[in-house]
UniProtKB/Swiss-Prot annotation:
Taxonomic lineage of the native organism: Eukaryota, Viridiplantae, Streptophyta, Embryophyta, Tracheophyta
Enzyme Commission code(s) on record: 2.3.1.199
Protein name per UniProt: 3-ketoacyl-CoA synthase 8
Family of the protein in this entry: Belongs to the thiolase-like superfamily. Chalcone/stilbene synthases family.
Keyword Acyltransferase: yes
Lineage top rank: taxon: Eukaryota
One Gene Ontology term, aspect cellular component: endoplasmic reticulum membrane
Subcellular localization(s) per the UniProt record: Endoplasmic reticulum membrane
Description of what induces expression: Repressed by herbicides such as flufenacet and benfuresate. Down-regulated by darkness, low temperature, drought and osmotic stress.
InterPro entries tied to this protein: 3-ktacl-CoA_syn, ACP_syn_III_C, FAE1_typ3_polyketide_synth, Thiolase-like
Amino acid sequence: MKNLKMVFFKILFISLMAGLAMKGSKINVEDLQKFSLHHTQNNLQTISLLLFLVVFVWILYMLTRPKPVYLVDFSCYLPPSHLKVSIQTLMGHARRAREAGMCWKNKESDHLVDFQEKILERSGLGQETYIPEGLQCFPLQQGMGASRKETEEVIFGALDNLFRNTGVKPDDIGILVVNSSTFNPTPSLASMIVNKYKLRDNIKSLNLGGMGCSAGVIAVDVAKGLLQVHRNTYAIVVSTENITQNLYLGKNKSMLVTNCLFRVGGAAVLLSNRSRDRNRAKYELVHTVRIHTGSDDRSFECATQEEDEDGIIGVTLTKNLPMVAARTLKINIATLGPLVLPLKEKLAFFITFVKKKYFKPELRNYTPDFKLAFEHFCIHAGGRALIDELEKNLKLSPLHVEASRMTLHRFGNTSSSSIWYELAYTEAKGRMKEGDRIWQIALGSGFKCNSSVWVALRDVKPSANSPWEDCMDRYPVEIDI
């Protein structure tokens, strides 16, 4: 029976194939051409519509996609050697100023000098940081003229080197963003730069003031937004802080801390949205994350410029500062994490979150391993305690925070520009390789915590006149606390 079925299907198959062969033998080339033409004519409108949609979607994508932002180069200001001071020299200046009656005028105020000396000894600052000329002469010069002189030397020094290294002409700059927190004269620092370098009349310039040590990342984010709107142009970001005008000569201890930490420094950064600059750029900007917790009174008031009881202006740092900084940092990390962490870390974080919320409230929060997302960390060199805390909470190794510690040791707290000195350190050490990811993170008054993420487009070598050129062979150093 089975054999009969097989024979039947074979006969049926052969018959069908024979029929098709006979039919096909009657179809010639002309018939095939007519068939093709008929179907093409019938579907011409459909084909045209599909082609139009493809072209339209492609054009729409090209017009609306975020434009890449490249970091062509950056320059950190290296002050002249005559501005270099050791801790002993600095405290000698303080005692001399007190004896001359310029500050802390009574003998009972000796403890204020001792208080600052103790902070300096434990600060992580080295013996070669810089203070401006106005604070090294007697009587002290803290007026507008001395303050302008310091700022001009820093900004013009960084910009001159940047233009020299990149070959970009000032007339090519279409966007300028300057940030300086406490020194904001009229005309603005941005206008001062426009005047000095004769920048073009239609330049888009902004001057950010009062935004603290995290303003460098804010300035980059603002420039990034402008580069999305204005095509085929360069943007310059300048980050600095003025020390001359901000030396506090009163007796409020919470205001004396800034005297011990802040030093002369500044940086200029050249950004571009021109596709042809990719070949020579060092980095591409991947993400910026900005967190501002100023709606909370404790956050808003933890670092405030104000007058003391004697009418002397200074910056007050409250006891809430560490708690506020930790909270703001936590929000920034929670926002940045999903953008940069690998899937495995995201899942671990999510599972822990669900367990803690619904099953075990006592369970500790999961800290993602950001070492899987970044090769290099540029943590704002605001102070030894800040670096220690981030190293501990993010479970980083001493190598990961080396750039921050060495920047604090060599240059002190240079405010918003410190993250650029740290990036320059990493380059000078020859550690920056193609594809490496960098996390710049800065905290500042307001209270704010801001992050920028970069990726290296090539093996990056230090630029000419790097601030580390004259001392790289001596770093890293052991820091005794």
